[in-house]
Swiss-Prot record:
A molecular function (GO) term: ATP binding
Residues annotated as binding ATP: 4-11, 133-140
GO biological process terms, semicolon-separated: N-acetylglucosamine metabolic process; peptidoglycan turnover
EC number, UniProt record: 2.7.1.59
Name by which UniProt lists this protein: N-acetyl-D-glucosamine kinase
Catalysed transformations (reactions): N-acetyl-D-glucosamine + ATP = N-acetyl-D-glucosamine 6-phosphate + ADP + H(+)
Binding-site positions, Zn(2+): 157, 177, 179, 184
Length: 303
């Protein structure tokens, strides 16, 4: 059995998958915020419960935000303060007496989608998350590409390209990002960025679901906003696709639930690509909230 953990700032979610990659059981508990020992106990207790339930010693994979293993073997995860700065992989491997694998949560999302029964035909899969922020991951021949610092796929921290500034206006504000830079695309393409763009142009503080509801009702202002957003997304994604050239792009995060993102994006891409380039297949993520657990479990299928 394959145990996949999706660990965030508020919850630790465990999913148990069989050899056919089907979810058999899941459980969630709150993430301890202050005590590393309590954090380790929470993970180990879930593993012990799964071992008892299924009568086996399952393999363990963990998806967690941040840098799973720095050069000195410690975790960097600002959203999981109890474990950040600790040698999490080594400590869990020792306590559980098995090889524990860690990866970035965005890589686990991409891995989950790449191992979808239909999508395994593609050698290079790109996951793109349009949620609270913008991120993603790259999967090549069923394995995540992490890079030495685990920042492969941090698409949200690319800067706005020149074509975007031409489209939006040269006086378009380059917003300061949480990373310390200015003009990172996640400030405009995330769910929060989607709402910020609307307020910037129309001076109305609406949230993304409200704007989308107006769009669905045929509101002209909301429709103009979505057109502008999709054009901006196409410009930025075109740069990424020119570098990566994937077979498939799978879009996740809250904005992936808005059908226009996946149905209208492809037609906007050709003018931002090289003439010889082919637009990849673009799909909405298929595994929803289970994707993080699923991808973490499948870290043991990448040998």
């Amino acid at each position: 059995m394959y145990y996949g953990f999706d660990i965030g700032g508020t919850k630790i979610a465990l999913g148990v998958f069989d050899s056919g990659r089907q979810l058999q059981w899941e459980k969630r508990v709150p993430t301890p915020r202050d005590s590393y020992d309590a954090f380790l106990d929470a993970v180990c207790e879930l593993v012990a419960e799964a071992d008892r339930r299924f009568g086996c010693k399952g393999s363990v994979g963990i998806g967690i935000p941040g840098m799973p293993e720095t050069e000195d073997g410690t975790l960097y995860a600002a959203n999981v303060p109890a474990a950040s700065g600790k040698p999490l992989r080594a400590d869990l491997s020792a306590r559980l007496d098995r090889d524990v694998r860690l990866d970035n949560d965005a890589n686990c999302f991409a891995l989950s989608e790449a191992w979808d029964d239909e999508f395994t035909q593609y050698s290079l899969v790109m996951g793109l998350i349009l949620g609270t922020g913008v991120g993603g991951g790259l999967i090549f021949n069923g394995k995540p590409i992490t890079g030495k610092s685990y920042i492969t796929g941090e698409f949200g921290h690319m800067r706005l390209p020149v074509d975007a500034l031409t489209m939006m206006g040269l006086d378009f504000p380059l917003r300061r990002c949480g990373c310390g830079q200015h003009g990172c695309i996640e400030n405009y393409l995330s769910g929060r960025g989607f709402a910020w763009l609307y307020q910037h142009y129309y001076h109305q503080p609406l949230q993304a679901p409200e704007i989308i509801a107006f769009y669905d009702q045929g509101d002209e202002q909301a429709r103009a906003h979505v057109e502008r957003y999709l054009d901006l997304l196409a410009v930025c994604l075109g740069n990424i696709l020119t570098i990566v050239d994937p077979d498939l792009v799978v879009i996740g995060g809250g904005l992936s639930n808005f059908p226009a993102i996946t149905t209208q994006l492809a037609e906007r891409l050709p003018r931002h690509l090289l003439p010889v380039a082919r637009v990849p297949r673009i799909e909405r993520a298929r595994h929803g909230d289970a994707g993080g657990m699923r991808g973490a479990a499948f870290l043991h299928l990448t040998d």
